[in-house]
Amino acid sequence: STNQKPEHHGCNCFIHPHPWMFPINQILKSMSWTKIMECVPNFSEGRDLQKIDEIVSPFRAKAGVKLLDYSNDEDHNRLVVTVVGEPDALKEAVIEAIGIAVELIDLNHHQGQHPRMGAVDVVPFIPIKGCTMEDAIAVSKEVGQRVASQYNLPVFLYEKSASAPHRENLAVIRKGEFEGMKEKIHQPEWHPDFGPAERHPTAGTVAIGARMPLVAYNINLNAPSLEIAHDIAKKIRFIGGGLRYCKAMGVELKDRGITQVSMNLTDYSKTAIYRAFEMVRFEAKRYGVSIIGSEIVGLVPMEALIDTASYYLGLENFSMQQVLEARIME
């Protein structure tokens, strides 16, 4: 089902420093910000390391902004960046990065496993500390207005920022991708929220919005058949009668001769990582297929990992208060 494609996922990624690799005093210093917002922009470039470096550069060494992670995937030809900061500083860095991507990426020459409609495909803002979902919505709308006027880019507001119910789901907006958007954008129900009702000739369109944190989680299967991965994905996602807060699709990893069930867990407190893992394993059995590994793309809330560890270790009455790093950060 097309409306269940995840926002982002990846494999064979070049993963760059994770937060636990930063000195603890650096993290504590950034946590002194009174308001912290997260942004996870997805760019349609996963192969050209020079372009990737240029796109990421606005997030480096900026006051009020911390680059936590970025991973590029060659199969999917996609870059996922995780950055946090004070809302105003974050906003400026994101707008600058979008401008660089619009300049560098030409989707007429882009091919990859991941669905995409724009050079900058999706830009979600997530409230983390001292700010509300309403604050994140306001930031997303301001960024949308500014990139539309500065870069002549059509902008769709999605998720919590959506201007209409049919625009909440990213995959519904993205259906038809860059190629199909040339005609789709002229339909009255698909006029952009900001910017011209004309697809940008090289950069396409962008979805910008506010949402809660999600976990991008992929499970690799020893199945060369993409059909098997598709079938498993259909069964575990919510629309197919599966897990309530799971979006999933099957992906082929040609260079490794395997397939993958790629998921977004949109509320990890209600659809746990371990539950997704076990359900994929359960469904894979009927095909005589087994799990050969899994991965988390980008960053993951500590709570989500603690929950999974507690399940597999059978921990009784375990809480976040028993996690050393969590206590240090208090």
Question: Which residues are covered by each model-predicted region?
Answer:
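Long, contiguous binding/interaction regions
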Residues: S32-E330
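Composition-driven detection of intrinsically disordered, low-complexity segments
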Residues: H9-N12, Q26
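Extreme N-terminal basic, low-complexity initiation segments
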Residues: T2-H9
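Short hydrophobic alpha-helical segments enriched in small aliphatic residues
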Residues: H9-G10, P17-P19
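Charged/polar low-complexity intrinsically disordered segments
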Residues: Q4, W20, Q26-K29
